[in-house]
Amino acid sequence: NVYEIINSNFVTIFGWMEDLLNKEPIQRVVKVLNNFDDSLKVEILNSSARTAKDAATSLNCEVGAIVKSLLLRTESNFILCLVSGDKRCSLNKVKKLLNMKDVSMADAEQVKSQTGFSIGGVSPVAHLNRTEILIDSSLSRYENVYAAAGHPNSIFKIAYKQLIELTKGKEEEIV
C-alpha cells in the first residue's frame, strides 16, 4: 500500500528529525535562541549543511547568506569569526585587527573542546566556553542569514542585525 509506505517513510524521517532536535548541542542552541527571541527556530534539514554550499543548496538561498563559523586560535585564546559563505576569512586582517603575530585555524579537537560543536555544525551561539566573536561586515548584504545550530543538519534563520545583538560580536572587515 503506497499510503503505508509514504506514512512509514514520514514517521522514519520525522523520528530521525525529532531525535536530532533532542541532541544536547542543538538543545543548547535552542535554549539561547528562545531566551533571546522565541520566534527564532532551529530547523532540521534532510540533507547536510556541513559546508556553506551544501547549506545554500538545501535552503535554496545564496551561498553568501550562509554564516560560516570559523574558530581561530590566537597567541592567548580563541576567537570565532562569522563570515559570509561566499567569502574567505583573512588571517592577516584578523592578525592586524588583534595586533597579534600568531593567528591560525583551530583544529577539530580544539573546535569541539572550545565550542562543544563538531566542525560543520558550529553555531555562533551556545559555546561551552566564552569566545570573542568577530562578524564580517560582508554579511550585512543580507537582511536575513542562516547559521548552523549545533549539528551539520541543523540551522536557524536570523536577521543580520539580530545576529550582532545575539552574539555581541564586533562587526569588522575580516575577509
Tell me what each language-model feature is.
Residues V2-E4, V11:
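Acidic, Ala/Val/Gly-enriched low-complexity intrinsically disordered segments
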Residues N9-V175:
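Extended, low-hydrophobicity, polar/charged segments
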